[in-house]
UniProtKB/Swiss-Prot annotation:
Family membership: Belongs to the MS4A family.
Predominant location category: membrane
Localisation: Membrane
Function of the molecule: May be involved in signal transduction as a component of a multimeric receptor complex.
Domain of life: Eukaryota
Protein name: Membrane-spanning 4-domains subfamily A member 13
TM stretches of this protein: 1-21, 36-56, 71-91, 111-131
Membrane topology: Multi-pass membrane protein
């Protein structure tokens, strides 16, 4: 759900920044918009799909893929947080015509900054439970092998 929210916020920023007028001081083009940080929400959607798939069809491969995708999502969310903090800490002057759009864009970045820790915590939680699931699968396989060997004697 947070991935979809981030993608919609990026779309709002796209519409907002496309309407800028080239002024004396130029247009406002933040680093998070150029890198498409909000578009990285697609990775959170893909990760959620893999978690659902691993729940429906549990296997070691599915759990490993879901866990690796969650780790990737954590890394991307941390990078997004850092880029957003850098964007919000610096503000170059823009044309007075674009000031309102730049101000609104910075407010959207502040909203997104509050969602990135949520994404990190959700991905971390799912990664921890994925590790627990993998450990249980390995323990169940070991006990099943031990029982088969004991039954053979």
């Amino acid at each position: 759900m947070t991935g979809i929210f981030c993608i919609f916020m990026w779309y709002l920023l796209l519409i907002l920044y496309m309407g800028q007028i080239k002024g004396v001081f130029g247009t406002y083009e933040p680093i998070t918009y150029k890198t498409g940080c909000s578009l990285w929400g697609i990775f959170f959607i893909i990760s959620g799909i893999s978690i659902i798939r691993a729940t429906w069809y549990p296997s070691q491969r599915q759990l490993t893929c879901a866990m690796l995708e969650n780790i990737l999502c954590m890394i991307l969310a941390i990078i997004s947080m850092i880029l957003t903090i850098v964007e919000l800490s610096t503000f170059k002057s823009v044309s007075y015509r674009n000031y309102g759009q730049a101000k609104l864009g910075r407010q959207i970045s502040r909203v997104l900054l509050s969602f990135y820790p949520l994404e990190v915590s959700m991905a971390l939680t799912y990664s921890i439970f994925g590790c627990v699931g993998l450990c249980r699968k390995k323990e169940d396989a070991r006990t099943a092998d031990t029982e088969e060997v004991e039954d053979a004697f």
